[in-house]
From Swiss-Prot:
SMART domains to which the protein is assigned, alphabetical: CRA, CTLH, LisH
Protein name per Swiss-Prot or TrEMBL: Protein fyv10
Molecular function via GO: ubiquitin protein ligase activity; zinc ion binding
Gene that this polypeptide is encoded by: fyv10
Domain LisH: 126-158
């Protein structure tokens, strides 16, 4: 009885391992919002305070007319009004992030109010999490509109990262269409964070701009390309010197060249590479998992259920026409069998075995009474014969050997 209670007791901490990104992303967005606030205030302070001092000195010394002083003050007032508008927008964004965080904390806190896995509240909570995982997978796969509709229908818009993934997919799509403007604007907004990134997204984007200039084979564009390289590629000389030398070599090779690496640099597949690189960089900066959460959850669940029998040489009972048994193993199902093929096996420290096991000549083990009862129900089977429920093979009862478990 105690063992049964232990097995059904809900461990909230283990469940929350999968849901860390649920709180990590709002925290990261709040941090970036604060950084933007500090940066805007610092920039305006560096302009307004010196300008105010200069205007005061000029007014007191008589070097400026009252009209000039008023014009200077009008400029400063205009900038401060602009600062106020920006700060109000950032404040609204902060309120939205805090509201989202509060909803997510409330959702996760519900787990601590559920004592058992058999509680109906746990089933309801799990359904909400499943909806979140499905929406996350849809957003990462580019089905943004469908994901938004599902989130609205389930009333869980605060629990999923719709805006973040929609923006990510929009920029990734623009790169696949051969445009770098949106991606470079995103890099400019996240310049400080990109310095710590393991990826060189901005360099690759600037390199692609250079390649497109060279592709035209126009002499005027060649000059523009060299100016572009000195301005945007040269600063990366210490870390990307090999790539910069290859870029210089493009001047001597036309777009239809077969010589590597120039052929690959001209290839249209580079746009796909840039799109994927942007997604990896975007997820790294926002502390998002590189894989969909559904894949992670499925991998853990499939591995926990997988046994060597699931991928044995014999076909599973769910797909075997000779089988007299119906498999309830999810791994043996046609939908999940291939997905689980490369996952590790479950670590079973205890086994549940029939109390009268026998082994058939083909090496498969069954309970004797269950095997005999099943064989008697088959009218086509001769007396003294037994049939393997999984493979359909027929053997003599005398060929059965008792199994002893030490």
């Amino acid at each position: 009885m105690a063992a049964e209670l232990t097995s059904t007791k809900l461990n909230a901490e283990n469940h929350l391992l999968l849901d860390q990104p649920l709180l990590r992303l709002p925290h990261e967005l709040a941090r970036r919002n604060l950084k933007s606030f500090q940066r805007i205030v610092e920039r305006e302070k560096e302009y307004v305070l010196p300008a105010l001092k200069e205007a005061a000195k000029a007014s007191m010394s008589g070097n400026q007319t009252p009209e000039q002083t008023l014009a200077t003050l009008d400029v400063m007032i205009s900038r401060m009004q602009g600062l106020k508008r920006k700060m109000e927008n950032l404040q609204q964004e902060e309120k939205k992030i805090h509201h989202q965080s509060r909803k997510r904390i409330q959702h996760l806190n519900q787990l601590y109010q559920i004592p058992s896995l058999t509680d109906v509240k746990y089933d309801q909570w799990s359904r909400v999490r499943l909806d979140r995982l499905v929406i996350d997978h849809m957003l990462r796969s580019g089905y943004s509109e469908s994901a938004q509709r599902l989130a609205r229908a389930k009333n869980i818009e605060e629990l999923v990262d719709l805006n973040v993934f929609v923006q990510c997919q929009r920029i990734a799509e623009s790169l696949r269409n051969g445009e770098t403007k949106d991606a470079l604007q995103w890099c400019n907004e996240n310049k400080a964070a990109l310095k710590k990134s393991q990826y060189n997204l901005e360099f690759e984007l600037r390199l692609q701009q250079y390649i497109e200039m060279i592709r035209t084979r126009d002499r005027a564009k060649f000059v523009d390309a060299m100016v572009h390289a000195r301005r945007y590629l040269a600063p990366y000389d210490e870390t990307q010197s090999a790539e910069i030398r290859r870029a210089a070599g493009l001047l001597a090779f036309p777009p239809n060249t077969r010589a590597e690496p120039y052929k690959s640099m001209y290839a249209s597949e580079r746009w796909v590479y840039l799109s994927e690189l942007f997604i990896r960089t975007h997820h790294e900066l926002l502390s998002l998992p590189s894989r969909p959460l559904m894949h992670i959850a499925l991998s853990a669940g499939l591995s926990a259920l997988k046994t060597p029998a699931c991928h044995s040489a014999y076909t599973s009972s769910s797909s075997n026409s000779h089988s007299t048994a119906t498999s309830v193993c999810p791994i043996c199902s046609t939908e999940l069998n291939e997905l689980a093929r490369n996952l590790p096996y479950a670590n079973h420290t205890k086994s549940s075995v029939e109390n009268d096991p026998v082994v058939l000549p083909n090496g498969r083990v069954y309970g004797l009474h269950r095997l005999l009862d099943m064989s008697k129900k088959l009218s086509s089977l001769e007396a003294g014969k037994v049939r393997d429920p999984t493979t359909g093979e027929i053997f003599n009862e005398s060929e059965l050997k008792k199994v002893y478990i030490m």
